[in-house]
Amino acid sequence: MKFSENWLRSHVPIQATRDELAATLTAIGLEVEEVTPLGESLGQVVVARIVEAVRHPEADRLQVCSVDAGQGELLQIVCGAPNARAGLVAPLALVGAKIGELTITAAKLRGVASNGMLCSAKELGLDSDASGLFELPDDAPVGQALAEYLGLPDASIEIKLTPNRADCFSVRGIAFDVAAACASEVVAFDAGMVAPVSTRTLAVELDAGKDAPRYCGRVIEGIDPSAKTPVWLAERLRRSGVRPVSLLVDITQYVMLELGQPMHAFDLDTLQGPIGVRHSRVGEQLVLLDGRQVTLDESFLTITDAGRPVALAGLMGGLDTRVTDTTRNVFLESAYFAPEAIMGRGRKLGLHTDAGHRFERGVDPALPPQAIEVATRLVLELAGGTPGPVVHAQLPEHLPQPARIRLRRARIARVLGIQIDDADVVRMLRALGMHVEAVAEGWEVMAPSRRFDIAIEEDLIEELARIHGYDRVPTTLPGGASRIAMPSETQLDELSVRRQLVARELQETINYAFVDAALLERWQLTEGLVPLANPLSAELAIMRLRLLPGLVATLGRNAARQAGRVRLFELGKVFAAAADAGAAPGESQHVAAAVCGDALALQWGEPARKVDFHDLKGDLMALAAASGAQLEFQPSTQPFGHPGRSADIYRNGVCIGWIGQVHPRLAKALDIDVDVIAFELQLMPLVQRALPRAGELSRFPSVRRDLAFLVPDEVSWAAVSASVRTTVGPLLREVQLFDRYVGQGVEPGFKSLAMGLILQDNSRTLTDRDVDAVVTDVVAVIEREHRARIRS
């Protein structure tokens, strides 16, 4: 938001200097980005009129001008501006004037004397326009100091507004904050009512419900099309970053900047019937003021005339109904459109307008009737005309209502940590335009209709802190004894998990906790999803159900950039919808890893090979060993896993995760052209561990017996090893699978599993009879329980 310092001071009388004003604005949250002083060195610049302009005898692009500067005699000025002409009124810098770093002196240009310089707005530091001389109105008083005529010195102040402060997109809105911060009061503003002189009206119909609940319109006939924008109004616009265009357009811009209410002016003679406000229809077209033809859909609000669209509500008017230099009859529009109805619509069409910027953040719903009276008064004062009555159409049930909030003095002290005097609380809130009534425990406060951001008690406390001054809130360090939690011996902490995985040459990655719904569909993870109410984007609209979709996508991006060996892991939370509709989503901590490419870094001592299931399983078993977890693996039917190369992971009979190769079809859909091996587990079941217990070391030798069985394909090693452990009992130190074979010599439907049994007793040396008895029992159990037979 850019505005004139003098304009602001006309609404709030303060004694603060310009620097103090800028500091105050920043301190109360209206961050000042730039202050541009205007007209501070124009002491010898006056209003002058060119009486005669002839071509320079030695230069085609120069003119020799005779200029009346109000000194009794004409001054000869050589000028190269393309718009220099007889009768033009423009600023003249007299000899001795200092313009920026340039001091004006009498000089000769191509042999012709020049006693001063006719100036452009840019040369005077008033605007960026350097296309020609700064043209002043024909009735500007010749000889008057330019600074006095233009109301200088002044400054153009630009502030940066946060999205919640839509009320400060106007000079008057800023004035309320300044008044509160400087213990002043905003100058009373009464728009008054302009009495109608004619009965001419246009009917207005509201057919957009809550999106357009208020619309004011007024006909003004017989205005003077030759009327020009007065210099005071044009300068206020220019110093606010708006270039003057024509009187009617400038008046609507002026009202928007002063009050915050965007307006539009239609040429009445181009309108054919009653005004309507409705949602556009698919395929409707409209030529906008900038000459572009746009095709609309049902998401846009349109202003219609006898059914045809004539303007995009809240964004831009139409070309066919615009006001021109010949307009004599005008229809003024002042309306309230809901922010949700305007938000994002301009971006769909590539439009960015001041009106749209304000409407999508929220305009005071009570302002349209006042704004149309102010605009009417300006039109009548500057261009004449006959006003008709204001047509006021509204849907009261859809108009936002000001919030009524109970503010407790005890709550102020609790939130801010300081006591603010009751009188100061009332003064600050009333200066901000709020209605305040005292009650037993504090105050009953009603926020003004322009303050959409005031809804709860904490909003009022924030306003008090902002105006009172954050720098006046003393710094108080929190007290109390700090208690450092002792690490638990019964579980492995996350840092240890990270270190274990890093030691296995895995690199940690941190992905968004939000994923694309389409990505989860590819993984066939569609149940229990938790959608976000306000996603960052459409691609990040679902809370992740697993770590693997995001982790594998990251791995794919790395693999696509010539990374030959990618080894990633992630620790993070996953989310699932609760079974009860009203309950909060559940969340749990998971750990996942994904690898692809070479199994080992390039070296001369080992032949190159690709990473496989058993490599990553070894990494997982090393992690499990750190917590003492005994993991079991069962064939998995997860749809995202390779059907023959994936397994569900169990601990103590409970499934806690998955490991395997990502299904080739899924990898192809993700544009990954290498095999991806991955695992994901619930973290807490993995890291739980029993307190270490010292066991007796046997002084007696161990005995090893190797057995090979033919077992059906569907029988897993986990089931076989479990039977062995149950059968042998405490004599079994370890059972190792050292060979798995399928092929010649093994009948179809079976596989050969070769295992080693390591037996040991703590009290004696095992005899051959002891060992043979154990082996006999193992063979019998495996043959009986798993339909296996000993391989000869």
Curated annotation (Swiss-Prot):
Give the record's keywords alphabetically: Aminoacyl-tRNA synthetase, ATP-binding, Cytoplasm, Ligase, Magnesium, Metal-binding, Nucleotide-binding, Protein biosynthesis, RNA-binding, tRNA-binding
**What does the UniProt cofactor note say?**
Binds 2 magnesium ions per tetramer.
| Region forming the signal peptide | none
Q: Which GO terms describe its biological process?
A: phenylalanyl-tRNA aminoacylation
Residues forming the tRNA-binding domain are 39-147
Instruction: Provide the assembly information.
Output: Tetramer of two alpha and two beta subunits.
Q: What class of enzyme is it?
A: ligase
Taxonomy of origin reads: Bacteria, Pseudomonadati, Pseudomonadota, Gammaproteobacteria, Lysobacterales
Q: Which InterPro entries match?
A: aa-tRNA-synth_II/BPL/LPL, B3/B4_tRNA-bd, DNA-bd_dom_put_sf, Fdx_antiC-bd, Fdx_antiC-bd_sf, NA-bd_OB-fold, Phe-tRNA-ligase_IIc_bsu, Phe-tRNA-ligase_IIc_bsu_bact
Species name: Xanthomonas euvesicatoria pv. vesicatoria (strain 85-10) (Xanthomonas campestris pv. vesicatoria)
Query: Record's family?
Result: Belongs to the phenylalanyl-tRNA synthetase beta subunit family. Type 1 subfamily.
Where found, per UniProt? Cytoplasm
Q: What is its EC number?
A: 6.1.1.20
What is this protein called in UniProt?
Phenylalanine--tRNA ligase beta subunit
